[in-house]
């Protein structure tokens, strides 16, 4: 679950 780390960038936060 990476979305929990980048909370606020669209879910995944990888973008």
Curated annotation (Swiss-Prot):
It comes from the Archaea. GO terms for molecular function: 3-methyl-2-oxobutanoate dehydrogenase (ferredoxin) activity; pyruvate synthase activity. The keyword Oxidoreductase applies. Coiled coil: none annotated. Its EC number is 1.2.7.1, 1.2.7.7. Keywords: Oxidoreductase. It catalyses: 2 oxidized [2Fe-2S]-[ferredoxin] + pyruvate + CoA = 2 reduced [2Fe-2S]-[ferredoxin] + acetyl-CoA + CO2 + H(+); 3-methyl-2-oxobutanoate + 2 oxidized [2Fe-2S]-[ferredoxin] + CoA = 2-methylpropanoyl-CoA + 2 reduced [2Fe-2S]-[ferredoxin] + CO2 + H(+). The keyword Oxidoreductase applies. Heterotetramer of one alpha, one beta, one delta and one gamma chain. The gene is porG. This is Pyruvate/ketoisovalerate oxidoreductases common subunit gamma.
